[in-house]
Amino acid sequence: CYMWVVRGGEDMHPVHLYNFKWTRSGKNVLEFLDGFEGCVLQSDGYSGYDSAVDFWNENHPEHMLAHSNCNIHARRYFADAVKATGSKTAKEAVKIYEEIFTAENKLRNLFNDKKISETDFLRLRQEKVKPVFEKFHSWLLEKQQTAAILNSSKTAEAINYCLKRWDKLTNYLDYSFLTPDTNAAERAVKPFVMARKNFLFSGSGIGARSTCFIFTLIETAKANSKNPEDYLRCLFEKAPYAQTDEDWKNLLPWNIELTPFKMRGEWVE
């Protein structure tokens, strides 16, 4: 059994969707994409995402999807090589990634603080970050042969992982709403993992889907800076009266008005 977590929505209104599936098949990804109106899917290097996006693009030529990969996963291969072999080449790759992430964070902070426009943000990425990636690519090609000759399997694996996915690791630069990694989605997994240590089981597929429903509400509320307890209370109070699509939209975390809790009745001794 698998819990799939999808993060999406607008920058200011993120949504965390939890989905229960019996398998890890790439067909599940196609189900998640059904009705998707976005332009890019960002994921780790799992091949199921590759096949799903390829299938989607073959069958939706009018709505092609770009596919971006996570640079943290790529960096992790080099970090693992450092731990396993102490490879100097892998250490150098980790340093290059730190340079990329540092530059990205500085630009993202300026953009989030509205000190630069979206146009300037994308332009500065091309000026500050893209050249580092280009040097990194040349460096990887140079080191690829050396790593193979030295039979540094961990380092060679890390280099090949990056080169194989190079376009998908760097195309995020063209989208202001994308970061170099999938950390935000990865962080959304942690609350479920921690909670599962307490409740242990969902009992059935229906129970697991109910768990997904509640986690979607709670974690989306938290992602939008809403107290989840207050949000759920107001949601459950107002949902029975929702009749139109507009009514339901007004119950989304970024639209709902959280009314103060009022105690009804009195305690009787």
Task: Give the label of every model feature segment.
Residues 1-269:
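Catalytic center-proximal scaffold of phosphoryl-transfer enzymes
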